[in-house]
Amino acid sequence: MAKKSPENASPVAQFEQSLESLEQLVEQMETGELSLEASLSAYERGVGLYRQCQQALEQAELRVRLLSDPAQPEAAEPFDPPSHDG
């Protein structure tokens, strides 16, 4: 079975995949064996992964807030995350 592409994966799967990639990138950078150019490229990729993780966490937090508002339990509804092109 083919692996889902990141664009088609669920937000949770995207978060987990981005976090795993970020952790691997940090490990590579911490070895000190990368050239300056490779380190800069890795850092740039890491910043992008970090932003993806932050965005996924913000969406999850919003979803939890929408679902757990005790003042308006009838207002709980499925969360459709905003689409981000980029």
From Swiss-Prot:
The keyword Repressor does not apply. The keyword Cytoplasm applies. Pfam families: Exonuc_VII_S. Keywords: Cytoplasm, Exonuclease, Hydrolase, Nuclease. Its EC number is 3.1.11.6. It comes from the Bacteria. InterPro entries: Exonuc_VII_S (IPR003761), Exonuc_VII_ssu_sf (IPR037004). It is found in: Cytoplasm. GO terms for biological process: DNA catabolic process. GO terms for molecular function: exodeoxyribonuclease VII activity. It catalyses: Exonucleolytic cleavage in either 5'- to 3'- or 3'- to 5'-direction to yield nucleoside 5'-phosphates. Heterooligomer composed of large and small subunits. Bidirectionally degrades single-stranded DNA into large acid-insoluble oligonucleotides, which are then degraded further into small acid-soluble oligonucleotides. This is Exodeoxyribonuclease 7 small subunit.
